[in-house]
Amino acid sequence: MSNTTTFTLTVLPTTLPVFLSASDTSLGLHHNRVPLGYVCSSATTITVRSTAAISLRFLNNNRNQERSVTVEANSSSSFTHNETYVPFADRVVGGDARGYVVECTVNNYLSVLPHYTRGLTDEAAFKNELRALDDNQSFAFLELKNALLLVPPPDKAELLALDLGALDNFYTTIVDTFDHLIGLVNVASDDPATRNFNKKYFCKADSNGVGAAYYDRNWTAQTNVSMSRYLQPRATNWLVLHEIGHAYDFQFVSNAPALNEVWNNVLADRYQYDFMSFDERQRDASVYENGNRDRVERNIAERIDNRAPYESWSFFQKMAVFTWMMDTDCGRETMARINRQFRQIKTFDSSPRYMPTFDWWVLLSDGDFVPYLKLMQVEFTSCRVLSNNNVVDTFLHTNSLVRSKRVYYPVKELIANFDALTNNYGFVAQSNYSLVAPGEVDARASLVIHCDIDDARQIAGQIFYVYDGTRLVWQSQIDDSNRLVVNDIHAGVYTMVAPRGRDKRYRVYFDEPASIAGLNEHLYLFADTSKPTKRLIYERLDSSPAGDRVAAHVLGINDLYRAKVIFDFKAKRMSVHSFASSFNSGYANMRYFVINVKRDQLYTFNHTFTGTQNFVGVMSVDIAPGDTMSSFHQQGDTRFIFLNAKSLNFTLNVSENWYSNTNLPSKNQVLETRMDECVAYLYANASRLIPFENHLKDELYLTIQSLPDKDYYMRLYNPFLPAHFKFNTFDPTTGSNSIIMAVVIFCFVLVALVIVFILVFVNQRGRQNPNAAEQAPLQHS
């Protein structure tokens, strides 16, 4: 029997949002298409004429039996295909808003394609039409609000038994949840980077697909002759949640550490969080391996104990790290801010650069997750790549201090006998690793802090402060034994603001826990129930950190951050911090970045990073005067940055306390640049940093002392210096001043601040600092 039909079809375009390009594959940009309305066979001939160049696809449930053809504008073409198939016309991405018109003749088709459109088609009538078809040609098409499903014959019975309204709701809630998590809105918005578009996800079967299922440019598919998993509207349907989540893998996801197969799972996990009860989540959530939360936690605890880099963890272990952050009050908003800022950068920056995700996360979040992420063996780059590939400091640790963030930490790490299952503290938690801020659990701790300092007079009589966010929790001075006794505060992690010396400068840090031991930029006080004794170390500083150590930065594919090389001339050590296993996949197993150190013509260190499958972690080697460091980077003219100089090759001759290379900045130039960075950051955050002693003031003072014209800079930057070195400052342990003198000093400082800002930012003695404006902390949108 010969069936022939001729019809005209208007195909409207897919809107191209400003934050995507036509070549992108995200958000199902190329998934939207229109069926021609018939099931066809090898005997079918399709003749098409279109007002625009279009793609026709002849689809079924096997990629090896499908075909894609192009129809040129205003020309007539005829096609056949030697399989059973359903023809579709792609919507043009970013095409004319009026769409294009297709004149089509289908000769000798098998049957009319049963087509269900939500809100328009009667479900019973649709199913009757499908039921009447022969099983071997019973393809069906579902046009839902956010999904298009080409259902193959093997799923006929399941489709007939399915509530299509429930299926539509399933896909709608998935897309709405994921869109909300990344900050896309469906209402009119003045910000084009937040506006949604008419996207739909095309779902099908593909018996020759990859893995169990996949997401790609043109559709998402189950690797089977059946697509039954895509027809099961339930919160435990991880396959569908996971694959649609891949639509939200934007360019920054592959930054260090690579979060491919993780970022999409974070979205999928939030769907389960929203649509499961507490008991269901304990039993069925994928993040807890379907009822094995204890095992998940034990395995992660083992990773922590072994100090295994986060990059080496399994996909689901990596996801769990995000799960516990997302469970907090500020988790979702942080994810939305990252995605909004990504879209703004991609939209308005002609040479976009994206931060490593965890650096981005802690800078944009309203909560402080630094101690938690350090516990989870995450290493921060603490720097930002600019559009010209110069690299600047983000002051990552200081950012949390500036913004007075509350600190979140796993409850089990604070309260040793806490058990989420028995709820023994009356605090409902999804996991023993659920994150809490101080006071959220009714458990208290008392601490004795021993201050280990070479000269107790440097801190005697001065106040130590402990904060929970902006709230002052405790304050006191050291006793005669150089101790601080903190009684009965809530278990949690706090910020301590400590005196840092009078005429001496110190690195100040706690020696525990190991994950943050030695952190000088932000003092985290751990009030836990099992370790009542703490040790606060005062390590004497007599030189500027900027003059003691310098860093080089290794970028890889798409200018993503890959490694940092640190030369510590004071400690006589070079360390290489590798943040990602894949540097540039285009180079595969060929050499990409090489660095070595020679002493007396013999290698003391020699390592080659290839394009892929590299070591992740830290490698170190001792260096000594007379050593030579050499490096090679395949793309080093833009992607190996040493003090913002770029080259394929660098050679450094190590001297007693610096290096010899006339193509690189001198030590004084490095110190002056760092001085400008410190002043710019202190100025931008004066209200929070000026009133308190902090590491940045110390660094500024020590940097100035290392410069030949230090007296000038001591006067110029006096308001930003540690208290002991400010003009006419009064040390209460040495005598008393009159009220009049105090008022005079206060007025002088105010006037000095105004004068300094004029001098620094208008003149700066003729020196330029093109990066200063970009070194203030990132602000959330």
Go through each PLM region and give its residues.
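Extended low-complexity, serine/threonine- and proline-enriched intrinsically disordered segments
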Residues: 52-64, 340, 457-472, 578-606
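Beta/coil-rich, acidic/histidine-enriched accessory regions frequently appended to metallopeptidases
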Residues: 1-4, 352-566, 573-577, 657-658, ...
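Catalytic cores of extracellular degradative/oxidative enzymes
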Residues: 128-327, 335-349, 357
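Zn2+-dependent metallopeptidase catalytic core
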Residues: 33-41, 51-203
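Intrinsically disordered cytoplasmic terminal tails of membrane proteins
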Residues: 765-781
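Extracellular juxtamembrane-to-transmembrane boundary of type I single-pass membrane glycoproteins
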Residues: 729-747
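Short, surface-exposed beta-strand/beta-hairpin micro-motifs centered on an aromatic residue
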Residues: 77-79, 481-488, 614-620
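Single-pass type I membrane-protein transmembrane alpha-helix
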Residues: 749-765
